Amino acid sequence: MNLLEKTRKINAMLQKAAGRPVNFKEMAETLCEVIEANVFVVSRRGKLLGFAIKQSIENERMKRMLEERQFPEEYTKNLFNITETSPNIDINSEYTAFPVENRDLFKTGLTTIVPINGGGERLGTLILSRLDREFDNDDLILAEYGATVVGMEILREKAEEIEEEARSKAVVQMAISSLSYSELEAIEHIFEELDGTEGLLVASKIADRVGITRSVIVNALRKLESAGVIESRSLGMKGTYIKVLNDKFLSELEKLKSS
């Protein structure tokens, strides 16, 4: 395959995704095929987002690293010293992707490191390694193209997380604002009693202790449940089982209590 055909191979993988999130494993496998090298897509914290192996490396530490999908902390930190594509790093470098304890077996091992950037920050690193020949300019063009695609995908995921967090927070705030003063007071006492994200409570006991009617507690729980903030289930004489579904609820409730 020439450079154009290889680029088209990557494009075909992207077009196949058609608006869906790009799978990091698929991206690694496509780059592995067109560049003919081992490919590792590593997050800024060293998590292995995706990888594909062209030449198997028989080493227990490497095997464990792939199983745990985590690069060593020290190695990951050192990668941040590389701010632009660094091709053909040999086995004696601290940046080699080959096991240094087996240097003699991997004398010809070469590593190429491509920073993954986006939104003005370092998002991760694309690491390529192979034994048989140097990485040439065509390989580097494909690697940098791949790193750009991965960077865009990481940014998209981060934007989705922020959006989801904002949505969860808004749902909680709306649910809390729908409560009357006495219902809010009841909810505060319920979750003090619960002391966590799920548990069992007896509504009548809380009603007697706080000095409110049981119906206030029932209404308050019903409002939160209809908003999807909690799940509640009556267990008859044992009481009511409650589970928090929205992880923003308890922190927002705490803010109200301290304000």
Curated annotation (Swiss-Prot):
It comes from the Bacteria. One of its GO terms (molecular function) is DNA-binding transcription factor activity. SUPFAM superfamilies: Winged helix' DNA-binding domain. Keywords: Cytoplasm, DNA-binding, Phosphoprotein, Repressor, Transcription, Transcription regulation. Signal peptide: none annotated. One of its GO terms (cellular component) is cytoplasm. It is found in: Cytoplasm. The modification Phosphoserine is found at residue 215. Its main location: cytoplasm. Pfam families: CodY (PF06018), HTH_CodY (PF08222). Residues 203-222 bind DNA. One of its GO terms (biological process) is negative regulation of DNA-templated transcription. Residues 1-155 are annotated as: GAF domain. DNA-binding global transcriptional regulator which is involved in the adaptive response to starvation and acts by directly or indirectly controlling the expression of numerous genes in response to nutrient availability. During rapid exponential growth, CodY is highly active and represses genes whose products allow adaptation to nutrient depletion. Belongs to the CodY family. HAMAP family: HTH_type_CodY. This is Global transcriptional regulator CodY.
